[in-house]
């Protein structure tokens, strides 16, 4: 009897271990989703998830919020994307990088270490996009070539210290591997940097084949698809942000692109019907 119990216990332990291995190997976390679009593989990584407060969209009628079912908050996320294209693996943005950040564990679930990241493209310099680049004073992605808009870089470097402290510190830490591009430039991986300015001075969208990494083009998809003229308080130049939002959405719709947005609701992919 004792032998039978020991054997049964061993089988249960082995089964549990195998299930754990299977889960780790074959079942990605709920914050990860990969889509293949043409010759490009895009993996969504949810650094964090939350709703956007309706209050960040001033002037929106309560009746509209009620009709859309978002009066208590607009579904959103804090996301990054990993793109594999033309033999290159590129990380777009790094999330908030503070307690609760999921980026590094999610990369680990894919078998990717921070030092494996060779290319890091930035949509803009807000803290929830560059925050994961540093851990205190330590560089998180020591082998990454960092690409950012020249317009974005120059604008932030010339802001008052109380606004640009994080951006200055972060860019300084990566200065030996920092590459500044102009809108329209083609970057490694045959990825085109597109003008999406307005949210920030050099806010950038990235065209990767049939996928478009749209950055912060929309913070509240449910609302801004209906009213693209509505801006969150985070948009620095609201007129430019509206123009960029309408242009990017129109371009994506016309060309049948997969939109990938850092604050789209999970999973942060969107394709608009023509």
Residue ranges of predicted features:
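Boundary at the C-terminal end of the N-terminal hydrophobic targeting segment
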Residues: 20-23
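Conserved beta-strand hairpin/beta-sheet module of binuclear metal-dependent hydrolase folds
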Residues: 28-109, 205-218
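Active-site HxH/HxHxD metal-binding segment of metal-dependent hydrolases
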Residues: 53-54, 95-176
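Bacterial N-terminal signal peptides that target proteins for export
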Residues: 1-8
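Active-site neighborhood of phospho(di)ester-bond hydrolases with catalytic His/Asp-centered motifs
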Residues: 91-94, 118-128, 147-149, 195-198, ...
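Metallo-beta-lactamase
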Residues: 36, 116, 143-195, 200, ...
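Active-site environment of divalent metal-dependent phosphoester hydrolases
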Residues: 99, 125-132, 200-204, 219-223, ...
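Cap/insert and terminal regions of metallo-dependent hydrolase folds
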Residues: 210-274
């Amino acid at each position: 009897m004792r032998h039978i119990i020991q054997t049964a216990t061993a089988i249960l332990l082995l089964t549990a271990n195998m299930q754990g291995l299977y889960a780790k190997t074959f079942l990605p976390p709920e914050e990860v989703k990969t889509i293949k679009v043409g010759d490009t593989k895009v993996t969504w990584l949810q650094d964090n998830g939350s709703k956007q407060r309706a209050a960040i969209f001033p002037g929106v009628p309560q009746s509209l919020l009620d009709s859309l079912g978002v009066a208590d908050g607009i579904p959103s996320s804090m996301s990054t994307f990993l793109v594999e294209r033309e033999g290159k693996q590129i990380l777009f943005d790094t999330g908030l990088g503070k307690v609760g950040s999921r980026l590094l564990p999610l990369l680990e679930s894919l078998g990717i270490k921070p030092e494996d990241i060779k290319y890091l493209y930035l949509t803009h310099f807000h803290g929830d996009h560059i925050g994961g680049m540093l851990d205190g004073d330590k560089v998180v992605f020591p082998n990454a070539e960092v690409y950012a808009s020249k317009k974005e870089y120059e604008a932030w470097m010339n802001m008052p210290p109380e606004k640009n402290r994080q951006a200055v510190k972060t860019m300084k830490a990566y200065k030996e591997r920092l590459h500044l591009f102009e809108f329209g430039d083609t970057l490694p991986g045959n990825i085109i940097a597109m003008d999406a300015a307005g949210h920030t001075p050099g806010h950038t969208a990235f065209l990767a084949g049939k996928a478009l990494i749209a950055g912060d083009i929309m913070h509240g998809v449910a609302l801004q698809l209906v009213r693209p003229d509505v801006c969150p308080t985070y948009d620095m130049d609201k007129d430019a942000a509206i123009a960029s939002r309408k242009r990017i959405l129109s371009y994506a719709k016309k060309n049948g692109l997969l939109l990938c947005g850092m604050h789209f609701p999970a999973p942060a992919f969107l394709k608009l019907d023509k």
